[in-house]
């Protein structure tokens, strides 16, 4: 069974009962490079495997980028 959630402002259908960690794996996103906000609350990375996504939840991904060159 699928549920509807909002991911980065867009409606998506996902499998009912999955955790944040499972959702990230399904999207091929490495947990160590993203911060997840669930219903306007930042979720601690250690809780990704136990936090279940529910119908109507709002999920935001914030990715960390590296690289570049800074000169004075």
Where are the language model's segments positioned?
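Compact, glycine-rich, soluble single-domain proteins
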Residues: 6-7, 13-43, 47-48, 64
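Short, Lys/Arg- and Gly-enriched loop/turn segments at beta-strand edges
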Residues: 66-72
């Amino acid at each position: 069974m699928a549920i509807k959630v909002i991911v980065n402002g867009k409606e998506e259908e996902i499998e009912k009962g999955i955790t944040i960690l499972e959702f990230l794996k399904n999207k091929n996103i490495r947990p160590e490079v993203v911060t997840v906000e669930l219903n306007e609350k930042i979720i601690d990375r250690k809780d990704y495997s136990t936090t279940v996504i529910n119908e109507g939840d709002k999920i935001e991904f914030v990715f960390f980028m590296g690289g570049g060159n800074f000169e004075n």
